[in-house]
């Protein structure tokens, strides 16, 4: 009896679900300095670079057994010192994101249940319900994550169209391209603050090894999943830029920037220039589904990374041990310190750049020297692509450090 192989669609949905988070709603604000044309260039540059680095990880991964993740590859090719650096960066990012998703998703769950039953539900109950359902999916199998994510992505697309269809149709070209701006208006001086935000919008690298295992070593199919999943995200991001930056003039962004991109303030300001209707409620639903899909994608990558470190197998006991180490630390931290991630979240982008930009280029360079090209997949571009991705990582690290130190211009509206 033949075993049905996972679908390309399912793999693409896992990637799209991981990449598209509720944070994308703040992208038009974060890129308001470079405005639409600049944000389009930055998004395309970041998408290509992040996709390429993910495909580099995929090629390297083909030389190792199914289930091997960063720990095995970095230790073998770059040595123990780099493995510690990479391991700390991976764990920091994935655990902290899981923590944040439990906190925000739990809050939305508590409000949703409270509204449905006509009473008040505690944040803790909301967090446990949100966490319990999604963590079970990851513990059970990647196929269940695939199925659940596909449903949620469908809901996200519908709510996105519902919320933005009219705004996209009504986008005004003079506003979108800022044609009324005074002569000599600067845009590119704000690129350094836009880059880290766009990088965070294309993070899926923890899922490459998971997908290769899920697709039973079919690397070309994984590569197509990465292409399709990230392209879906790119199209949604560009449409969201058009919806907002095509209706809300650049010089009117001051209150939104002051509120750090808060969606309610964005919609309130936007309503002065366009019909927004019940956009706030629809975007809340979109955000909830985006947080859920991101939780599934991020924790699936963390789950397989931990299983690789400890060499735990796919038996019930092995997956239970892996699940305990994947989910209990962020859950307990979230319940005990519900706002503790605020300080650390600012450093997620910096840590993510290490293992999504710097490490993949180094891994492929060493892998090509040790093994030659991948067993059944070779990423395009050769040596110059490695240089491109490595420099992309360096540029983003520099941009984030300079932004943290407030040494680059910040657009105020």
What kind of region is each of these model predictions?
Residues 157-166, 289-301, 325-329, 348-374:
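Hydrophobic alpha-helical segments of multi-pass membrane transport proteins
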Residues 3, 7-8, 120-129, 218, ...:
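Loop-to-transmembrane helix boundary motifs in multi-pass membrane proteins
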Residues 52-118, 284-308:
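Hydrophobic transmembrane alpha-helices that form the core helical bundles
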Residues 10-19, 87-88, 112-141, 156-163, ...:
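Transmembrane alpha-helical segments of multi-pass small-molecule transport proteins
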Residues 28-59, 411-413:
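Extracellular loop-to-transmembrane helix junctions
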Residues 1-29, 51-55, 67, 190, ...:
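Membrane-interface "cap" regions at the ends of multi-pass membrane proteins
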Residues 120-129, 143, 150-268, 412:
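Helix-loop-helix junctions that connect adjacent transmembrane segments
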Residues 68-80, 231-291, 312:
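TM-loop-TM module centered on a large, flexible mid-protein loop between adjacent transmembrane helices
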């Amino acid at each position: 009896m033949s075993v049905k192989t996972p679908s390309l669609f399912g793999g693409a949905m896992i990637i799209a679900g991981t990449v598209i988070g509720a944070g994308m709603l703040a992208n038009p604000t974060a890129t308001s300095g470079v405005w639409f044309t600049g944000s389009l260039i930055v998004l395309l540059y970041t998408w290509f670079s992040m996709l390429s680095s993910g495909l580099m990880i995929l090629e390297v991964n083909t030389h190792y057994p199914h289930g091997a993740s960063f720990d095995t590859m970095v230790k073998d090719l770059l040595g123990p010192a780099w493995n510690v650096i990479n391991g700390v960066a991976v764990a920091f990012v994935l655990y902290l994101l899981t923590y944040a998703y439990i906190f925000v998703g739990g809050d939305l769950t508590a409000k949703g249940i409270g509204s449905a039953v006509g009473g008040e539900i505690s944040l803790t109950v909301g967090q446990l319900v949100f966490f319990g359902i999604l963590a079970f999916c990851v513990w059970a199998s990647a196929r269940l994550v695939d199925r659940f994510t596909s449903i949620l992505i469908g809901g996200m697309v519908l709510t996105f169209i519902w919320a933005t269809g009219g705004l996209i149709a009504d986008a005004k070209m003079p506003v979108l391209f800022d044609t009324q701006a005074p002569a000599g208006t600067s845009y590119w001086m704000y690129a350094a603050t836009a880059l880290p935000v766009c990088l965070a919008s294309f993070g899926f690298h923890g899922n490459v090894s998971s997908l290769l295992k899920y697709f039973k070593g079919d690397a070309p199919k994984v590569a197509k999943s990465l292409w399709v999943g990230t392209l879906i995200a790119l199209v949604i991001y560009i449409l969201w830029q058009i919806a907002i930056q095509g209706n809300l003039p650049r010089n009117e962004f001051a209150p939104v920037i002051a509120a750090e991109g808060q969606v309610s303030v964005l919609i309130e300001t936007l309503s002065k220039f366009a019909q927004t209707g019940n956009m706030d409620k629809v975007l809340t639903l979109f955000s909830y589904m985006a947080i859920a899909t991101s939780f599934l994608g991020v924790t699936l990558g963390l789950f397989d990374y931990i299983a690789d470190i400890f060499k735990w197998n796919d038996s019930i006991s092995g997956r239970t041990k892996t699940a305990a180490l994947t989910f209990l630390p962020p859950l307990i931290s979230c319940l005990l310190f519900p706002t503790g991630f605020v300080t650390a979240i600012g450093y997620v982008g910096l840590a993510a750049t290490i293992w999504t930009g710097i490490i993949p280029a180094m891994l492929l360079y060493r892998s090509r020297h040790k093994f030659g090209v991948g067993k059944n997949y070779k990423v395009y571009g050769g040596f110059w692509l490695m240089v491109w991705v490595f420099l992309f990582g360096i540029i983003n690290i520099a941009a984030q450090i300079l932004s943290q130190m407030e040494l680059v211009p910040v657009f105020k509206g």
